[in-house]
Amino acid sequence: MYISSAALIIDGKVIAACPEERLNREKFSRVFPKKAINYCLKKANIKFDQIDYIANSYNPAVHFKKFNPIFSNYRRFRGDYYYLIPDFLLNNERPLKEDSEYSYQKIKLGKKELNIYYITHHLCHAANGFYPSPFKKSAILTADGVGEDDSVNFLVGDNNKIKLLKRLKIPHSTGSFYSTFTEFFGYKPEADEWKVMALSAYGSKNNKYYKLIR
């Protein structure tokens, strides 16, 4: 589950960040983060026309290449994923350009032209872990339910660059496997996994399920 949020970065430093749910009071809110964006701008005391770039932690262009990889190799109806992109982007004269790691397009808001980058989900996870770390070079492993069509990425970070070495694609996902057990225990999958993590402190491996799962 991707929760709507916004963050403002100036000269490589995070100035403000806020999830939309804190402002609209809707748990796990997935609406366009208008209030969160306004909060960040107000926090930094700047206007929207002072923004140079916009980055999104998901690359919808990957979905334009094929349908659900669980069922088919090619997409049959692209409209299934159009809701991921605001209308003003879809109607833009410059179409979304496809790339393996990120896609971009330019839009005009008033007189200002903005570059919008759609970065693959797992690359964002990798950057979030590597760049704030004290390491100049490091092996990186990302694993969640699903990115665009990846479930696991093996990468290496070297100074200011991150290189993808290998990827695992859905449905082969340890994250989805974990979510299945979250639902089995009576919780909401893709939302309550943290509760299962907390419960694990009270568990014991000396039971009949341990060997079965292993």
Residue ranges with predicted function:
Residues 1-214:
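Short acidic/glycine-rich loops and adjacent helix/strand connectors
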